[in-house]
UniProtKB/Swiss-Prot annotation:
UniProt binding sites for substrate: L86, C87, H88, M122, E123
Species, as recorded: Mycobacterium tuberculosis (strain ATCC 25618 / H37Rv)
A Gene Ontology BP annotation from the UniProt entry: Mo-molybdopterin cofactor biosynthetic process
Subunit comment: Homohexamer; trimer of dimers.
Protein name: Cyclic pyranopterin monophosphate synthase 2
Positions of the UniProt region annotated as Disordered: 1-23
Family membership: Belongs to the MoaC family.
Active site: D137
Catalytic reaction list: (8S)-3',8-cyclo-7,8-dihydroguanosine 5'-triphosphate = cyclic pyranopterin phosphate + diphosphate
Functional note: Catalyzes the conversion of (8S)-3',8-cyclo-7,8-dihydroguanosine 5'-triphosphate to cyclic pyranopterin monophosphate (cPMP).
Length: 167
């Protein structure tokens, strides 16, 4: 398990999305301060060198995979509260989805920003997940064995707990 700076600040032993009876509920954020929030998440699509070359040159039958995945990730971040039952609707002020192309993989990184009462980690994770799923959809005809892997939050800042970074 990866360690993170400030990890002890997060280990209160209580799950915020359960009430005293253990039932799921949406956290009431009415009294929380509105602050600038940022989260960065990443994930990896593992495939073959041939598929990475097709993606890099735009040679896939379905078209420009990276451009399509970027737009899909941005759209997904904006729809997170529709997909994750207990997430709040947030007014996102920025979403960036970027790709680092390796020899056998593509790393997907999403950065999400907002000025709101709750964090944007779920929006960043959703952006990465849907961008990765979109890439898979676009390459599955040439590599059905491609693997989506290692989706995680890398960094968050803002709110009562301040900054957290995965080490």
């Amino acid at each position: 398990m990866a360690r993170a700076s400030g990890a002890s600040d997060y280990r209160s032993g209580e799950l915020s999305h359960q009430d005293e009876r253990g039932a799921a509920h949406m956290v009431d954020i009415t009294e929380k301060a509105t602050t600038k929030r940022t989260a960065v998440a990443a994930g990896i699509l593992r495939t073959s060198a041939q598929v990475v070359a097709l993606i890099s040159t735009g040679g896939l039958p379905k078209g420009d995979a990276l451009a399509t995945a970027r737009v899909a990730g941005i759209m997904a971040a904006k729809r997170t509260s529709d997909l994750i039952p207990l997430c709040h609707q947030l007014a996102l002020t920025g979403v960036d989805v970027d790709f680092t192309v390796g020899q056998l993989d593509i790393e997907i990184t999403a950065t999400v920003r907002s000025t709101d009462r709750t964090g944007v980690e779920m929006e960043a994770l959703t952006a990465v997940s849907v961008a990765a799923l979109t890439l898979y959809d676009m390459i599955k005809a040439v590599d059905p064995g491609a693997l989506i892997d290692d989706i995680r939050v890398l960094h968050k800042e803002g709110g009562r707990r301040g900054t957290w970074t995965r080490r």
